[in-house]
Regions:
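N-terminal glycine-/serine-/threonine-rich phosphate-binding loop
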Residues: 1-51
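Short beta-strand segments
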Residues: 7, 74, 97-102, 123, ...
Length: 408
């Protein structure tokens, strides 16, 4: 009988996945809340404690750290010595592992999270099982992301998970555990240094590829766009493209520059026909718009409405604004959208679009429309990392939170 070891915090798709494994003849090994969820769904589950013959100890801190578990994951099926040693120790192979980790990052981001709560959400057994299974991916299928359940199910139903897929899944495991450890390390350093820490001794950054670009800054250069995984600040990198052609390298540069300008004015929201900034400098009520072309601002202004702000920004230099990128600190309404579609623009960036405004913008087939979400989530106060084309180096400085006084 084949065995699948399942222990997850994120239970998305869990029951459906386990049902397929059961139908395919797998014995399900599990612990704690995962085992309960599967039993509640009517599935047969073998507790890891019963399988290993060792009870959970230390308030559940030690559940799966056992030779019968890790031997079943690490033993090479094609090595006669491993097979014989496993048999002599009563260790049976485990063919599939589905594990995801305690939600450490979500825990430390909760308001009021205590140090003790954070420590209890550092997973030990999960990363150990993932790493053992991933190391021996020649024999074991390991799944850390519930989004991969469907492709694994399809492969199993088609005769087995191919080595190429197992290798790709193993790669995802090491990427996941690497980021997990980096977040823990960063948290502990911040805790030990306290408020005095501005620049950590080490920076652990991870990015995921959003898209491959047609070319880079120049046509002879290749390019790709990446998103930082741990960022929370409203940003072009975390925006959703609602319409238009694929974003280019220079579109991203210009959109980012324009958005950073309007973020200087805080997040504006409708309030009784005017615009009220949720974090405006000196209490001034403003809508803000900025126009950037070739990474250079060619117009920026404030006004009582997004339309007013845009018209003022455009009138700063109408010729340069043609074919530019426009960003707002307020939701785009229909009057603003009509002004935007009256000329040629590459990209419009905003923290939201009214339905009628979006329909108006979609009349321009190629116009890229980017929704970056609420600017209230602006998490400024961290570090700005500067790539100054110094090979092997990054410069860092505290984020600029200075707000210049202004009037409408």
């Amino acid at each position: 009988m084949k065995r699948a070891l399942i222990s997850v915090s994120d239970k998305s798709g869990l029951v459906e996945f386990a049902k397929v494994l059961t139908e395919l003849g797998y014995e399900i090994l599990s612990t704690g809340g995962t085992a309960k969820a599967l039993r509640d769904a009517g599935l047969t589950v073998t507790d890891v404690a019963a399988y290993t013959g060792s009870p959970e100890i230390l308030d559940g801190r030690v559940k799966t750290l056992h030779p019968k578990i890790h031997g079943g994951l690490l033993g090479r099926r094609q090595d006669p010595r491993h097979v014989a040693e496993m048999a002599s120790q009563g260790i049976t192979p485990i063919e599939l592992v589905a594990v995801n980790l305690y939600p450490f990052e979500a825990t430390i981001n909760k308001p009021g999270c205590s140090f003790e709560e954070a420590m209890e959400n550092i997973d030990i057994g999960g990363p150990s099982m993932l790493r053992s299974a991933a190391k021996n991916h020649a024999d074991v299928t390991v799944v850390v992301d519930p989004a991969d359940y469907p492709q694994v199910v399809e492969a199993l139903r088609s005769g087995g998970v191919p080595l190429s897929m197992r290798q790709d899944l193993a790669r995802k495991v090491f990427q996941h555990t690497s980021r997990y450890d980096g977040i823990i390390s960063g948290y502990l350093e911040a805790q030990s240094a306290g408020a005095a820490m501005k620049f950590p001794s080490h920076l652990f950054l991870q990015f995921e590829k959003v898209q491959t670009l047609r070319y880079g800054e120049n046509p002879h250069q290749q390019g790709a766009f990446y998103r930082e995984l741990s960022g929370r600040e409203a940003a072009v990198a975390r925006g959703r493209q609602l319409h238009g052609k694929e974003m280019s390298y220079n579109n991203f540069l210009d959109a980012n520059a324009a958005l950073e300008v309007v973020k200087e004015f805080g997040a504006a929201q409708p309030q009784g026909g005017a615009i009220a900034a949720t974090s405006p400098p000196r209490g001034v009520t403003v809508a803000a718009a900025a126009i950037v072309k070739h990474n250079n601002p060619c117009g920026a202004a404030i006004g009582d409405t997004p339309r007013d702000a845009y018209m003022r920004a455009r009138d700063t230099d109408p010729i340069s604004a043609f074919g530019g990128v426009v960003a707002f600190n307020a939701k785009v309404d229909l009057p603003t959208a009509k002004e935007l579609t009256a000329t040629f623009l590459e990209v419009v960036v905003a923290p939201g679009f009214e339905e009628a405004a979006l329909a108006e913008l979609k009349r321009k087939k190629d116009l890229r429309v980017l929704d970056v979400g609420p600017l209230e989530a602006d998490g400024r106060g961290g570090l700005d990392l500067l790539d100054m084309n110094l090979l092997g180096n990054r410069r860092a400085q505290s984020a600029s939170t200075l707000r210049a006084p202004h009037t409408v």
